[in-house]
Structures are given as structure tokens and as C-alpha cells.
Amino acid sequence: MRRDYIDIGYSPKETDLVCEFHIEPTAGVNFEEAATHLAGESSIDSWTEIATLSPELAEKLKPHVFYADEGAQTVRVAYSEELFELGSVPQVLSAVAGNILSMKIVDNVRLQDIAFPKSMINEFKGPNFGLPGIRKLVGVQDRPLIGTIVKPKVGLNSEKHAEVAYNSFVGGCDLVKDDENLSDQKFNSFEKRAELTLKLAEKAESETGEKKMYLCNVTAPTCREMIRRMNFLKDLGASYVMVDIVPAGWTAIQTLREEAEDAGLALHAHRCMHSAYTRNPRHGISMLVVAKLCRLIGLDQLHIGTVVGKMHGEKHEVLNLRDQCVLDKVPADESQHILAQDWRGLKPMFPVASGGLAPTMIPDLYSIFGKDVIMQFGGGIHAHPMGTVAGATACRQALEASLEGISLQDYAKNHKELETALGKWLKK
């Protein structure tokens, strides 16, 4: 292992990819040695001296540890763009979040953030629709969107699934999606479910005068089957597909993004399984990195947490994810381990707040996120005492109250669906 990777005076070039890591050296290893091994293992080096690594090549491609704070257990490393296949998320992660997570020389390593250079951003298309395109697709410009997940998660047959979706639509939902673990099971086949639900979505549009979007899950065993399912939806007249981004894998997601553009379909990203490597604050990969990769690849909307619901995520973490979704230029924030990122005009993603939400939480959601959020409810709609239609209606009523600055209690006086929801979910 070379010893010249510590380069505190180095100023990253515009073409460098920069990463921030949290590192905890194992007992008996000093901080600088751990940082050196991390930088080398994630780029050009190995555990011992390599005869095939010429001085010229090493000087050209070596990483630069330009920031090291032992007290904060933080290092920043600048990598030459030549180390990467610029349009490949799997290759980038294999380098900066690959073997380094398994090294014995450190007890914990966490990739906190990646700042992508212009050359890499230019290799990606970003979202095809993005936030503005989704608003145009749905025909709603001035309020949050209301969505739901068909519940129960699994077990309904295709006919019942479509009926629950229809009731959600006529009650006021803009979007209805499959649950993340529903794909093509025997009790509810993908093709039959898609046909029936899209037909009832069209019926709900004609009855309500609003656009209604069904987000059918195309996550599949192979990329070939995933694309076949996507094209099946396209032929049925769908506008959307959803995909479980972590179980599917980054190669599958990049493939889907390319094919979805040709098909003219928007992409909804469900982040299930992300906590396997994002939740531990000392080891793995941050959700911030996952969100940035999603925008880079070009997903149109992404689950980011709720602050007020059942999912893990502090308010500042969720809002940092929101910023990476919607801002064109994200400023650096050392206290939050955020590197400056210029998205260079890539379209913003639509943030999705989902997980343990009820209509009573809508004022808080609106206060936290503003209008540019998709508020997505599961049990908060389908557990309404008056049924799914009333549950969706209660959500729209709560949103209308929030937009007008009226308390839910006052608005509920003339809206029985909301009044019933308050009786069930409002904390006494």
C-alpha cells in the first residue's frame, strides 16, 4: 500500500468525484493509516506493494485525502474521473462503497455523500418527467398530490385489488400504487391486475373529471421480464410504473430508465430494503447517497420519509433528502455531512412522504414540505370507519383545510368524512 494518499493541501478539481466518509479505525490502527487504506482500496491500490502499479500510473490516478478530522471521524477523498465508467452507477459504487466496507483495518465505514462532477452528470439524463412533468401529467399544479397504496399489502385477488383502487380514486386520490411486495403472485397476477385496475382508473377519471394514475409494480426476477411488464403497461395505456429500487438493483434501474423514456412512462421509486445499509449512522451508505443516485439515473419520484409517520428518519434527514430531490444547487453543510452539489439542470424529483400517515397529519405534512410533495396513505385511508372512499375523501378534505388555513376541527364541522377521521386518529 502506497503512503502518499494523504494530501491535505490538495484542492479538488472540477473533474474530480468527491466522497465524504465516516471512518472508525480498528484498535491499534491510527486514523491516518485507516484513511490511507480506505483511499487506496477504493481506487488503485491493494493490501501490499504491487509491481504492476507503475509510479507514472499511480501519480496519474491516485486518490487525494484532502480533508481529515480525526475528532469528527470524517475524511473526504477526491478521485480522478478516469477511475470511473462515468455512466455506470454499479461501477462507481463498486469503487467507493465496495470492498472498503469490509476492510478489517476499520470497525466502521460509512459513505456519507458523493459530489458528482459535471462530466459524470453529463453522462446521465436525470428524470424524464420529474416534478414539473408529473404535475403536468396529473393536471395538478398548486397543491400536494394525494396517493394511496392498495391494502392489505398482499392477499387480494385482482378484482378486489382493482375495486380498492377505484374506491380510492373516486374518493379523491390522484395516485394509487401497488404495495412493494406485490408483483405477480398466483392470487393476483400482474397482467390481470394491470388490466382491471387501469380500466377502473379510466372509469374514475370520467366520473370525477380528474386525472387518475395507477402505479403498477414492474419489479421482476430479470431485467427482460421487468421491461416486458413495462411494455405491457404501455400497451394498456398506462402513464406510470413503479419499481423497488434496492431489491431490483442499480443495473436494473438504469435499464428501466432507458426503456421507460422510449415508452413515455413515469417512474415511481420505492426504497424498500434501503435501511439494510442506510440506517446505521456509522456503517454502510447514507440514504442521501441513494437519493442522489436516483436523481442522477432519472427516477421521477422517490420515497424520502415523513417526519411524522412510522418510518425512521429525523426531520433534518428527511428535509436534506427533499433538498436533493428538488434543488438545482445544494449548498455544502458540514454539520450534516453534505457536500455541495450542482445538478446542472437535471429535473427535480417529486418527493414522496409515505409510511404510517393518517389524514390528521396533513397539516403537519403541509407545514414541513409545502406543496411539492406526494402525500401517500395506506391504512390512513383504508382503515377509515366509513370505508376506503371516505378515507380518501377525508384526506382531500384535510388537504383543502390546510391549503385554506382552516383547522381540521373547524373544517370537519361540515365534512363528515373528516369528522369521522378525527374521531379515529386525532390524539386526545
From Swiss-Prot:
Catalyzes the addition of molecular CO(2) and H(2)O to ribulose 1,5-bisphosphate (RuBP), generating two molecules of 3-phosphoglycerate (3-PGA). Functions in an archaeal AMP degradation pathway, together with AMP phosphorylase and R15P isomerase. Binds 1 Mg(2+) ion per subunit. Because the Archaea possessing a type III RuBisCO are all anaerobic, it is most likely that only the carboxylase activity of RuBisCO, and not the competitive oxygenase activity (by which RuBP reacts with O(2) to form one molecule of 3-phosphoglycerate and one molecule of 2-phosphoglycolate), is biologically relevant in these strains. Pfam families: RuBisCO_large (PF00016), RuBisCO_large_N (PF02788). Homodimer or homodecamer. In contrast to form I RuBisCO, the form III RuBisCO is composed solely of large subunits. Mg(2+) binds at K177, D179, E180. It catalyses: 2 (2R)-3-phosphoglycerate + 2 H(+) = D-ribulose 1,5-bisphosphate + CO2 + H2O; D-ribulose 1,5-bisphosphate + O2 = 2-phosphoglycolate + (2R)-3-phosphoglycerate + 2 H(+). HAMAP family: RuBisCO_L_type3. Its cofactor is Mg(2+). Signal peptide: none annotated. The gene is rbcL. The modification N6-carboxylysine is found at K177. It comes from the Archaea. Keywords: Carbon dioxide fixation, Lyase, Magnesium, Metal-binding, Oxidoreductase. Its EC number is 4.1.1.39. Belongs to the RuBisCO large chain family. Type III subfamily. GO terms for biological process: AMP catabolic process; carbon fixation. The record marks K310 as: Transition state stabilizer. This is Ribulose bisphosphate carboxylase. GO terms for molecular function: magnesium ion binding; oxidoreductase activity; ribulose-bisphosphate carboxylase activity. Substrate binds at K153, R271, H303, S354, G355, G356, Q376, F377, G378, G379. The active site is at K151, H270.
